Amino acid sequence: DHPHIFHVGSLSLTDQPARDTTFYAVKRAKNKGSVISYDPNYRASLWPDEKTAKKHMRSLVSYVDLMKISDEETELLTDHKDVREAAKILYEQGVKVVAVTLGGEGAYIYSKDGGCMVPGFSVKQIADTNGAGDSFWGGFLYKVSTSEKQPDELTQEDLKEFARFGNAVASLCVEEKGAIPAMPELAQVERRIAEESYS
């Protein structure tokens, strides 16, 4: 009938008719009861200018339940460089859970329980950082999906666990070349978490 989580980026917002189609799909999914996930994933080369990008990327925020941005996108989405302030602003605009990725430092999560830092994992070597943010968010959404909770039911402890899982996925992803081939399997992620817990 409808997906549990409906995920969208901003690339389909760059031009018509894709922009209107994206809004139609998001509104339809939300009306059907789907959780809306959004990763703006700003790519300057795909927009005519930054002002246009800001306008259209921000236009989707009011429909979103779960949102992931990088620390390089905070100012673009909120006019604030500080990750804590940016996350709080997005939450106040209606986003239930905001995750700001911080590269190797981990992620900052903001929700109804306030904000918390979730540190990253140590990596053996960095081969390729492409896909690190996507792999983090994929891992995070996997945990949201399997929790069977609505976004506003998630506790800070839940979110710390989900972000830790996402950080583990990302740490494995950057150790291999190629964003897609580098995506780890569940057993690898669980092993990475177990190793870090005992080290």
Language model regions located:
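Generic, low-specificity signal for short hydrophobic/alpha-helical stretches with a mild N-terminal bias
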Residues: 4-11, 39-42, 72, 122, ...
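Conserved beta-alpha-beta core of the PfkB/ribokinase-like small-molecule kinase fold
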Residues: 5-8, 13-89, 95-96, 105-106
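Conserved phosphate-binding/catalytic region of the ribokinase-like
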Residues: 27-28, 79-199
